[in-house]
A protein has these predicted regions:
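Catalytic-core regions of core metabolic enzymes
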Residues: 1-105
Length: 105
């Protein structure tokens, strides 16, 4: 007998991830061609809040860059994680602690 359970989420429970009012880019970068730089570039015309997160920078372009997801002034609805795979698990845990609505890895 299988003990596997499937959890089905309603659209309302996924709204913050699917229709975010704010997005954090964890691993944001100014390095040309890096994943963090490309994600930020793709969000250039996004009308919601964009929070670059990387302890190496104080600013990226005209945006304040936060040293960690827990230092972002309000929990973003979505976080795009662009860090090295060895750091992903801890970043996801930090996102949960910070109250992020959902993550994209």
């Amino acid at each position: 007998m299988s003990t596997h359970r499937t959890t089905v989420y309603r659209h309302a429970e996924l709204a913050r991830l699917l229709h975010p009012a704010s997005v954090a880019v964890i691993g944001a970068s100014t390095r040309p061609g890096s994943f963090g730089e490309r994600v930020l570039d793709n969000l250039a015309n996004y009308t919601g809040g964009v929070y670059p997160v990387n302890a190496r920078y104080e600013r990226i372009g005209d945006r304040i860059c936060y040293p960690s997801i827990t230092s972002v002034p309000q929990p973003p609805d979505c976080a795009v994680i662009t860090v090295a795979r060895d750091a992903v698990e801890q970043v996801v845990l930090d996102c949960a602690k910070a109250g992020v609505g959902g993550v994209i890895v």
